[in-house]
Regions:
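Extracytoplasmic copper-binding redox domains, predominantly the cupredoxin/blue-copper superfamily
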Residues: 19-130
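Sec-dependent bacterial lipoprotein signal peptides
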Residues: 1-18
Length: 130
């Protein structure tokens, strides 16, 4: 009887640990942009990775006519992010979940600070179109 109680107790503890432990899903396996630290595809296509609640790189200069693509490289299940110009109407993405991407082509030179709406107090970056 004692042995049976010990076995059931051990099984119960194992089940409880499995149910309540926090397990990450690991890195995003999908987009190649998340696996390789690439920010320039060619002279008119640039990648900004969203990882660890930050934009990488956090400052980028591109020529007029370039397309910038933001890719959410956070683990599956993390909070969504946006990429939104500080100046209203320049650009703004919908919520980007893990693996999602948003692209915008910049025709006009200028300085464009931007942020993530849900995390705008700390998740900020700058884009310069030359």
């Amino acid at each position: 009887m004692k042995r049976l109680i010990v076995v059931f107790g051990a099984v119960g503890c194992a089940i409880a640990l499995a149910c309540f432990s926090e397990r990450g899903s690991g890195p995003v396996a999908g987009p190649a942009e998340c696996r390789v630290p690439v920010s320039v595809i060619d002279s008119l296509h640039f990648i900004v990775a969203i990882r660890n609640f930050a934009f990488h790189p956090d400052s980028i200069a591109v020529p007029a006519g370039a397309t910038v693509t933001w890719v959410n490289c956070e683990d599956v299940g993390q909070e969504p992010h946006t990429t939104t110009s500080d100046s209203a109407g320049v650009w703004g993405s919908a919520d980007l979940t893990s693996g999602d991407r948003f692209s915008h082509t910049f025709a006009t030179p200028g300085k464009f600070p931007y942020h993530c709406i849900p995390h705008q107090t700390f998740m900020r970056a700058k884009l310069v179109v030359q």
